[in-house]
Regions:
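Extended basic (Lys/Arg/His-rich) segments that typically form rRNA-contacting surfaces
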Residues: 1-245
Length: 245
């Protein structure tokens, strides 16, 4: 299981070596940190909670501050189902390097909200006839039930709120990875608007955080060594007499 959180940036196109044009979506993914590890025995489900995106500490509620007390504040947190032997622990961080070009992933996001829409746009109805004595019937749904039950059955397709729902697109191919910019180039379109949160995952492979953990520890050591703490030297008795004289 490999998973990461990201945001949708834009769509563009790239050219393959054979000259074919491929539409791609740029996704700003990671770096992410593991904020909680859930087990089936304690929590009823085996999952990993992943945090993404910087957040100011004063914007966190008290429960979130307690939940992230030993970690940096994050803006988004999502759970991913994982097997019991995933090997991750709280505080582990990882980037887009967990994926490689050619991987097949599924991308979940919230689709664009369209507001209240009629049946023609929402469900693809053809509408009524536009001539031969019909008036104001072009986009009407038509009959919604017969007279015998004298009621409308549940699930009848009618006008209503369209969009703004979680949509998952499966079997998308990762064409390229930019580790310096933390970007993924995913073939095709992904749900949601620009800046929307995306959950990218695949059941294949395993997240290896050993390299990232070593680099983090090395950075901390360097920062500690760079601190210059100056301690004033104690003056001897002869020096103090010379100063008073």
């Amino acid at each position: 299981m490999r998973c990461i959180l990201g945001t949708k940036k834009s769509m563009t196109q790239i050219f393959r070596e054979d000259g074919t044009v491929v539409p791609v979506t740029r996704v700003q993914a990671g770096p992410c940190v593991v904020t909680q590890v859930k087990t089936a025995k304690r929590d009823g489900v085996s999952a990993v909670q992943v945090g993404f995106g910087p957040q100011k500490a004063f914007r966190l509620t008290k429960p979130l501050k307690g939940h992230l007390k030993d970690l940096d504040a994050v803006r988004h947190m999502r759970d991913f189902r994982a097997p019991e032997n995933h090997g991750l622990s709280r505080g582990d961080s990882f980037t887009v390097s967990i994926f490689s070009a050619g991987d097949r992933v599924q991308v979940a996001g919230v689709s664009k909200g369209k507001g209240f829409q009629g049946v023609v746009k929402r469900h693809g109805f053809s509408g009524g006839p536009a001539s031969h004595g019909h008036k104001d019937q072009l986009r009407m749904p038509g009959s919604i039930g017969s007279a015998d039950p004298a009621r409308v059955f549940k699930g009848m397709r009618m006008g209503g709120h369209m969009g703004d729902q979680q949509v998952t697109v499966k079997n998308l191919e990762i064409l390229a990875i930019d580790e310096e910019k933390n970007e993924l180039l995913v073939k095709g379109a992904v749900p949601g608007a620009r800046g929307g949160l995306l959950m990218i995952s695949t059941e294949d492979g395993k997240i290896d955080v050993s390299t990232g953990a070593d680099e983090t520890k090395a950075e901390v050591v360097i920062e500690d060594q760079s601190e210059d703490v100056s301690i004033p030297e104690e003056k001897t008795a002869s020096e103090e007499e010379a100063v008073t004289a």
